[in-house]
């Protein structure tokens, strides 16, 4: 057997074992049988709210079991083909089988990471905010590089994205942006990316070729479901309208279609300029505000709001989560998990899966630095 194929088989088998244990497939199978009996009872609909809860649980379990069973079935099918190709010395088929194992190992690793999702909101869409730190041109450029990195990361995971709001820098890059990430488990994949990111490189904007350090921060919060009620009093809101801006601060609309909403009690601000309609921008900004307030409330309940707010707002040395060094050597290191890689180009192109997996695993084990 080829070494490459052997390694892929070993990795997939390990992933299947971990997924089996993490999801507790046996218990899920038993629970699904119970739910099928409960939902088949016509009297269930006498209590519509309870019926909806049970149906959501049933759908969630069915999805988990289907994903696991499909992965296991595909693995067994390819193993069978590989055994026949080995006997027949069919090298062309073996080449294809090696690629099939490679693709399957990526899927298995993704599912293994998703087993670490523990919050109900992990399955939701999410919003990602990026804000440049102090430093003008350097930090604005770094913020735009981060935006590209996260857009690529979302694309790698099969998520759709929508740029809700973006404020361009005076010369290059962006001062800030808000991206809506659309897809099942989006928040689970992005939530550990919240914090301050530090870049060290030879400045492309400095004629002397000096090495510069730049900071930018990111904050992630889940889009909340419609059935979660967030009460916001009109008297607590300040709503401002303005013209949407383009590069260099140029106005791209002749009407005040962009909307900024401030929740006065918490000083929480959202804004949207992605649509030409002021009404639609206001609705989106309000939806973002509800999501932000929900996130803040959840943080308070878990006694982590102080830490999260520090990560969000303090673009300084003391609150970093990750360092990206491009010169004099190349390394990206997560300061929480110590996971690092020299593939700086890959990371900036959105290859962040290993960083996310390491953070989720650390949180699951409780071994926080």
Curated annotation (Swiss-Prot):
GO terms for cellular component: cytoplasm. The keyword Glycoprotein does not apply. It is found in: Cytoplasm. InterPro entries: PCRF, Pep_chain_release_fac_I, Pep_chain_release_fac_I_sf, PrfB. Signal peptide: none annotated. Keywords: Cytoplasm, Methylation, Protein biosynthesis. One of its GO terms (molecular function) is translation release factor activity, codon specific. Methylated by PrmC. Methylation increases the termination efficiency of RF2. The modification N5-methylglutamine is found at residue 250. HAMAP family: Rel_fac_2. Belongs to the prokaryotic/mitochondrial release factor family. PANTHER family: CLASS I PEPTIDE CHAIN RELEASE FACTOR, PEPTIDE CHAIN RELEASE FACTOR 2. Peptide chain release factor 2 directs the termination of translation in response to the peptide chain termination codons UGA and UAA. The gene for this protein contains a UGA in-frame termination codon after Leu-23; a naturally occurring frameshift enables complete translation of RF-2. This provides a mechanism for the protein to regulate its own production. This is Peptide chain release factor 2. It comes from Rickettsia typhi (strain ATCC VR-144 / Wilmington).
